[in-house]
């Protein structure tokens, strides 16, 4: 992914219409201005308290760690390890009775030449009319002479999605026949091989968004939620897009309810974090810049996006230190729980008995 500042003159015009930022944060040379999220009357359905408590106690931490271990190897597109990880993801979901399609295509990449890419598309009901799409990328960055594992980028997000499918097997069964269902999407080729640009990055996302646009399938996506750079301690998330702000507030609400019930781990079991984590999902929105990532081809085609990526990025981003040692398992377990409950609330709240 890459940080981008928007066109200067356009942004100056937009800034004049925005509330005064409370503060600024800086990351990789780019400045993000934060504005408070306005309080709105939107109140989507919530899970009943008994259901929320019941689902909060569902977990399989051992499976999550095993999934991370399986994926946490160098997995550059075109390598044997890349195929191993792809087959692991595909088989894991097929074993859980998901319908899995591998969208294969080839493209030319700098340095590497012609490469074969494979997006993984898993659905509970391939004939559903609408989908909540949870997504991440599974390739790792090409770094000659360096063993780059990409723990946060994006072994942990991949493992979180597989763990969600594992933990929620029973709860997701109704979605095999419902009009609204769940899709797990693992993009290939997110990383650039030489220098990030329109033809050297997000290969899988660019291909799939274009394909689905021509096939008329993008209209079936309620919202695409993209997970990236997760697993390091003390992340801070923000709302990037106004049209999904109500759903950002819902995931923020899930975190708040879990914290009040003391169901979030407060200390890191990995020893990475030396203090209690602060709130993950911040009560501010970013309005003056955005991050290039797998969501961009879908955003340009008017698909609603919820981008779950921490700002600032983890300090180990695109370095050999993005390995197992950076993973804070308290944070990882907490985020996995929040995302599971958010998905259940989105998909099931309207049908649950109050």
Swiss-Prot record:
One of its GO terms (cellular component) is mitochondrion. It is an enzyme of class 2 (transferase). Residues 1-8 form a transit peptide. Optimum pH is between 7.5 and 8. Disulfide bonds join 136-158. GO terms for molecular function: glutaminyl-peptide cyclotransferase activity; zinc ion binding. The active site is at residues 190, 228. Its EC number is 2.3.2.5. Keywords: Acyltransferase, Disulfide bond, Metal-binding, Mitochondrion, Secreted, Transferase, Transit peptide, Zinc. InterPro entries: M28_QC, Peptidase_M28, QC/QCL. Zn(2+) binds at residues 153, 191, 318. SUPFAM superfamilies: Zn-dependent exopeptidases (SSF53187). Inhibited by imidazoles (imidazole, benzimidazole, 1-benzylimidazole, 1-methylimidazole, P150/03 and N-omega-acetylhistamine) and cysteamines (cysteamine and N-dimethylcysteamine). Inhibited by PDB50 1(3,4-dimethoxyphenyl)-3-(3-imidazol-1-ylpropyl)thiourea. It catalyses: N-terminal L-glutaminyl-[peptide] = N-terminal 5-oxo-L-prolyl-[peptide] + NH4(+). The keyword Zinc applies. Belongs to the glutaminyl-peptide cyclotransferase family. Acts as a glutaminyl-peptide cyclotransferase. Responsible for the biosynthesis of pyroglutamyl peptides. Might be more efficient in the conversion of tri and tetrapeptides in vitro. Might have a relative preference for substrates containing hydrophobic amino acids in vitro. This is Glutaminyl-peptide cyclotransferase. It comes from Drosophila melanogaster (Fruit fly).
